[in-house]
């Protein structure tokens, strides 16, 4: 049967088409390889173009070609079926095995024989995890997750050491070659060595990438199976080993933590908190925080698990499947990847700990790329239709051409979302596209970055995100042109716009209390921080404090 299929796949037949131009009779002969994988319409178009055929035979040629392909394909299918039957008759194929295969396929594809639809694994696991994290087993879950995190961190450390050694060795080799350049070696030798070094680095990075991917996949499977098993054991009141199973990991972890004796020292953060009221008729109360911190500090796990760190992690886990999610805004460029800048740093943090609930960051970005490509293609086709109908002016034409030219990227003000369960204090990341215009001092409330913030806050209202962290100055790092007046103008603009958006939110969600965290870069001075802190009560209506005194 395989031999017949091989002959069938390599078979060629000649398509003959006769037509007449005036008194001259012509004949077109084209060899076709069967089976024909190409669409008949595409093949017909190629024939018309390649042989410069007249347009009046176009439809007739198309019908003749489609008919020829259909007839010859049916003939090949019939001969292939005959060969299969002969193989069954001759005993080359086991009849009973073939019958069981057909019966299984029929039962799986026919509704009356199909099994009842099983519950979705992800939904089951989410429900089970939500039950366990709100039970006495929560500490066990967190410690197991932390042990997995330490394991991956050690693996990443080994990778970094090996890559560093390779780069140092390659640097020494390149220095020696450069010393001989022009003497015994040429530019071609240098380029050849550089290419070898690049290939060696790529091979080593791919090796470690595959190892990390495999390790995280194993961890995820083990963790999910263990969670399901623990949940089943909790339902069995007669299981005497259950309490020991829950207790063993915390005690082991505390011993290892005490043995390590490491104290995590992070850069001192500046922080101010405010309680504000918005609205005149429908009053809503919200919490605002101004922080001097790195945006990724909300994502990073600590190698040692102090009480404060553990409480943050517990709170994040408790609210993972709740209506009180936490999000942050990352300012990124227009390319949907994790190759540079804060995108690369964020992806590195995500890779340090296995995500047991959602796909890896790379898989989520691949899905976003496909969605963005589809959306941009749809937008491009609509722009083309509008241009063809003559309803667009020159400026719109230029804008649509620009969209066509960059249809694989997103535009300033657009954003994409990734979901995470493996970050310290964050469930959702909004990747907001901005351009170099945010570094200028003349942006307005209609700037794409500002409108992007508005749309992000709207998503927060409709998707149960009650805490959102926003870069106040719309930058993650300070530069020379960002003077004190620049910072004050930018902060005032963002404060006022966010205030307006939060007042809009009252009509979107009914006035749910939310927490908005405004972050400024760590390199900003204390004096500048306190100037921004003094500005906030001038824009938002801060709740007045009430001082209680006792009478003696």
Curated annotation (Swiss-Prot):
Annotated organism of origin: Rattus norvegicus (Rat)
UniProt KW Cytoplasm keyword: yes
Phosphoserine: residues bearing it: 79
Keywords noted in UniProt: Cytoplasm, Endosome, Phosphoprotein
GO cellular component term of the entry, any: protein-containing complex
GO terms under biological process: regulation of mast cell degranulation
Function of the protein: Component of the FERRY complex (Five-subunit Endosomal Rab5 and RNA/ribosome intermediary). The FERRY complex directly interacts with mRNAs and RAB5A, and functions as a RAB5A effector involved in the localization and the distribution of specific mRNAs most likely by mediating their endosomal transport. The complex recruits mRNAs and ribosomes to early endosomes through direct mRNA-interaction. Plays a role in mast cell degranulation.
Subcellular location: Cytoplasm; Early endosome
Keyword RNA-binding among record annotations: no
Subunit-level organization: Component of the FERRY complex composed of five subunits, TBCK, PPP1R21, FERRY3, CRYZL1 and GATD1 with a ratio of 1:2:1:2:4, respectively.
Name of protein: FERRY endosomal RAB5 effector complex subunit 3
């Amino acid at each position: 049967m395989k031999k017949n299929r091989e002959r069938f796949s390599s078979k060629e037949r000649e398509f003959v088409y006769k037509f007449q131009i005036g008194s001259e009779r012509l004949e077109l002969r084209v060899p076709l390889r069967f089976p024909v994988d190409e669409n008949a319409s595409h093949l017909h178009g190629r024939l018309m173009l390649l042989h410069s055929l007249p347009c009046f035979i176009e439809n007739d040629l198309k019908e003749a070609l489609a008919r020829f392909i259909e007839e010859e394909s049916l003939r090949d299918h019939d001969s292939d079926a005959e060969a299969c039957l002969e193989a069954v008759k001759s005993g080359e194929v086991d009849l009973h095995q073939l019958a069981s295969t057909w019966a299984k396929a029929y039962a799986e594809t026919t509704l009356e024989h199909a099994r009842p639809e099983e519950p979705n694994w992800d939904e089951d696991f989410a429900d089970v995890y939500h039950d366990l994290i709100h039970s006495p087993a929560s500490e066990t879950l967190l410690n197991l997750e932390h042990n997995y995190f330490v394991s991956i961190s050690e693996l990443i450390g080994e990778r970094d050491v090996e890559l560093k050694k390779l780069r140092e060795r390659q640097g020494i080799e390149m220095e020696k070659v450069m010393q001989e350049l022009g003497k015994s070696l040429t530019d071609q030798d240098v380029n050849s060595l550089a290419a070898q070094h690049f290939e060696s680095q790529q091979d080593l990075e791919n090796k470690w990438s595959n190892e990390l991917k495999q390790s995280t996949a194993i961890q995820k499977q083990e963790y999910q199976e263990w969670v399901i098993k623990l949940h089943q054991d909790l339902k069995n009141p007669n299981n005497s080993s259950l309490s020991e199973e829950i207790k063993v990991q915390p005690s082991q972890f505390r011993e290892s933590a005490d043995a390590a004796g490491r104290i995590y020292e992070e850069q001192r953060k500046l922080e101010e908190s405010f309680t504000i009221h918005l609205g005149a008729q429908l009053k809503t109360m919200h919490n605002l925080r101004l922080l001097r911190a790195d945006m990724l500090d909300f994502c990073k796990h600590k190698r040692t698990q102090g009480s404060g760190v553990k409480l943050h992690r517990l709170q994040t886990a408790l609210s993972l499947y709740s209506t009180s999610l936490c999000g942050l805004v990352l300012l990124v460029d227009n390319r949907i990847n994790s190759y540079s800048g804060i995108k690369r740093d964020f992806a590195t943090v995500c890779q340090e700990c296995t995500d047991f609930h959602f796909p890896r960051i790379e898989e989520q970005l691949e899905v976003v790329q496909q969605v963005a490509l589809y959306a941009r293609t749809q937008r491009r086709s609509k722009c083309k239709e509008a241009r063809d109908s003559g309803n667009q002016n020159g400026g719109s034409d230029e804008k649509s051409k620009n969209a066509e030219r960059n249809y694989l990227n997103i535009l300033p003000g657009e954003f994409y979302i990734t979901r995470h369960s493996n970050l310290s204090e964050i469930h959702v990341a909004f990747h907001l596209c901005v351009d170099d215009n945010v570094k200028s001092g003349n942006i307005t409330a209609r700037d794409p970055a500002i409108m992007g913030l508005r749309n992000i806050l709207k998503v927060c209202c409709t998707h149960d995100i009650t805490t959102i962290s926003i870069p106040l100055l719309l930058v993650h790092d300070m530069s020379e042109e960002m003077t004190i007046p620049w910072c004050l103008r930018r902060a005032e603009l963002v404060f006022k716009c966010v205030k307006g958006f939060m007042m809009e939110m009252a009509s979107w969600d009914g006035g749910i209390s939310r927490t908005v965290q405004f972050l400024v870069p760590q390199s900003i001075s204390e004096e500048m921080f306190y100037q921004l802190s003094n500005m906030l009560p001038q824009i938002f209506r801060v709740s007045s404090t009430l001082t209680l005194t006792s009478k003696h």
